[in-house]
Amino acid sequence: MTKSELIENLVSLNPALQVKSVEDGVKEILEQIMLFLERGERVEVRGFGSFSLHYRQPRVGRNPKTGESVKLDAKYVPHFKAGKDLKERVDLV
């Protein structure tokens, strides 16, 4: 599902809402998550999951085309950990 599809789905479930309002709401939620992560803070949505940053050590990588070694700097990458409720709902077995 894309962001546009999410917005369309929310509007179809709530016909009283304007598309622009839903779009602004979804964008603002995502923006707030990104702002907190930029500040190095963890974001937790109970039952859904949490967003945090994981540190990646500097390492030597390899260019797949040339085979040449490439030095990769250390960096922080976003990480999502699913919450208990989400895990239970998607367990299809």
From Swiss-Prot:
Q: Which residues form a coiled coil?
A: none
How is this protein annotated for GO cellular component? chromosome; cytosol
Q: Name one GO molecular function term.
A: structural constituent of chromatin
Q: Which PROSITE patterns match?
A: HISTONE_LIKE
SUPFAM superfamilies noted in UniProt:
IHF-like DNA-binding proteins (SSF47729)
One GO BP annotation here? Answer: DNA recombination
Keyword Transmembrane in record: no
Q: What keywords are assigned to this protein?
A: DNA recombination, DNA-binding, Transcription, Transcription regulation, Translation regulation
Q: Which HAMAP family does this chain map to?
A: IHF_beta
What family is it from? Belongs to the bacterial histone-like protein family.
Per the entry, what this protein does is: This protein is one of the two subunits of integration host factor, a specific DNA-binding protein that functions in genetic recombination as well as in transcriptional and translational control.
What is known about its subunit structure? Heterodimer of an alpha and a beta chain.
Q: Per its record, how is this protein called by name?
A: Integration host factor subunit beta
Say which species the protein is native to: Actinobacillus pleuropneumoniae serotype 5b (strain L20)
